[in-house]
Structure formats: C-alpha cells, structure tokens
C-alpha cells in the first residue's frame, strides 16, 4: 500500500488521522525489517526445502504486470518449519534460481537433503550447481494435474486411478512396473501425458528413498500451497500493488503473522 492508501484507510476504518511523515517513518522501518529478515543467517542443513510461487499484479511503467513472489520453506533437523526467504521475479530461469540458491548458501546453508518444487524452469540445474548433493523431487500432485490436462472428461477418473497406482506403489521397482502398464494402456491415446511421467521419472520418484510415513510430505508442495492461500487472505483487499516494495512489505507482514504459529 502507498502512504496515501494507508492514510485513507486509517481515516475511513478507524477515524484516526496520522500524518504522511509519520506513516513514512513506520513504513521505512518495515522496509528495514524486510531487508534484515531476508538477509538473516540460516541453519547449515535443511532436511526438506519446498519452493513455490504466488502471482500478484503490480504497476510498472504505466502498466499492470504479473510478478511472482517465490517462497522457500525449510524443515530443519529438529523438525520445525521455517520460511527461508522470498524472491521477486517475473520469469523463472536458470539464472534466477542460481541467484536464489547462491543467496541461501551465502546466508549459511551448507546442504539440503531434498528440494520439492513444481518442476520449476531452470531449477534443477541451479540447485545442482550450488548444492550438488541435494535431491530434487517434482511435486507429484502437480504432475497429476498437468497430465490430466491432456485427458478428455470421460477418461479422467480411470486415468487418475491408474496414475495413483504409480505413486502409491510400495517401492520404486513396483512403481516402474505400474508406469509401464500405464504407458501401454494410455500411451497411444495420450502420449504427451505419459511422456511427461517418463521424462521426469527420476525426479518424480525421489520420495521412494524415504520411509513410508514421510513420503507424502516429500512428494507434494501442499505445505507451501497452504501458506500461499493464507497470504492471499491477508492481501485480498489489494488487487494491484503500486510498487515492488509495497508488494514485498505486504507479503512480509503476512508471513510474520502466519509463521507465529510455527514457532516452537
């Protein structure tokens, strides 16, 4: 929100007047808090890091454009969640993700066991460059949604049930056998849907290396999607943000409220 927006809302909602200079002082403090938080030291090791983005509308050069706030949530060795940072971008690219990974490393992260993403463009190469021992798991739920886009309505239920046999298999070998049956059954009718499983197979099946009890939290980005939904609730009254800074402040304040419930 701009200073004038804040001034107007204070007057309309609370009947309280605050000078623009006072509001500016407060918002400047928030800017510093954002900077300090984004550059704070992190733990050396995270067991899992989930990454996803949430799109907002921002004014830029006299136009309204879509920009994405990318978030990283880590699970530390004590089993607690932590929002590691937020990064503003317009396009996913290897260079963008290289910058994000380098930022995490510069803040003290030495290793990540597993990263979970929605097959973000350029991500795998970037994390391999910075954290070569990390495993990258593509979110299976997103894979299911993307595959289903190719399927006509009358086939969707049966197609979904057959996909379920793949990721609910007890181990990777059984999952591979289910994939082969899936390909034989649907490959001619929906080749792109089947090929997307085959092409991403290694990154779709990392979760099989872990105990059954924790597989679901590894193969989905449900945790961070839930976080995104809560951010939407906090920011729903602002359809278009006037600047990048106002967007980052709003998301930061939302994250601070949400993460209070995560504190051990």
Regions found by a protein language model. Name each.
Residues 114-121, 126-162:
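Conserved beta-strand -> loop -> alpha-helix junction used to position metal-binding or nucleic-acid-contacting
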């Amino acid at each position: 929100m701009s200073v004038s927006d804040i001034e107007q809302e204070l007057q309309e909602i609370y009947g309280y007047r605050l000078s623009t200079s006072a509001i500016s002082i407060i918002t400047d403090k928030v800017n510093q808090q954002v900077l300090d938080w984004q550059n704070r030291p992190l733990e050396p090791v995270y067991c899992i890091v989930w990454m996803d983005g949430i799109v907002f509308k921002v004014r830029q050069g006299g136009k309204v454009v879509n920009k994405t706030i990318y978030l990283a949530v880590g699970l530390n060795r004590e089993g607690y969640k932590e929002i590691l940072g937020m990064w503003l971008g317009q396009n996913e690219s290897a260079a963008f993700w290289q910058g994000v990974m380098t930022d995490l490393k510069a803040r003290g992260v030495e290793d990540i066991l597993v990263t979970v993403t929605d097959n973000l463009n350029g991500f795998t190469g970037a994390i391999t460059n910075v954290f070569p021992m990390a495993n990258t798991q593509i979110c299976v739920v997103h894979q299911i949604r993307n595959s289903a886009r190719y399927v006509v309505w009358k086939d969707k239920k049966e197609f979904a049930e057959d996909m379920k046999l793949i990721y609910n298999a007890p181990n990777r070998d059984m999952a591979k056998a289910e994939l082969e049956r899936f390909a034989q059954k649907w490959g001619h009718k929906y080749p792109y849907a089947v090929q997307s499983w085959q092409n991403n197979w290694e990154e779709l099946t990392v979760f099989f290396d872990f105990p059954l009890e924790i597989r679901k939290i590894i193969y989905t980005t449900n945790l961070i999607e839930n976080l995104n939904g809560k951010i939407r609730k906090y920011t729903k009254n602002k359809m278009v943000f006037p600047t990048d800074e106002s967007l980052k402040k709003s998301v930061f304040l939302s994250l601070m409220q949400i993460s209070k419930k995560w504190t051990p």
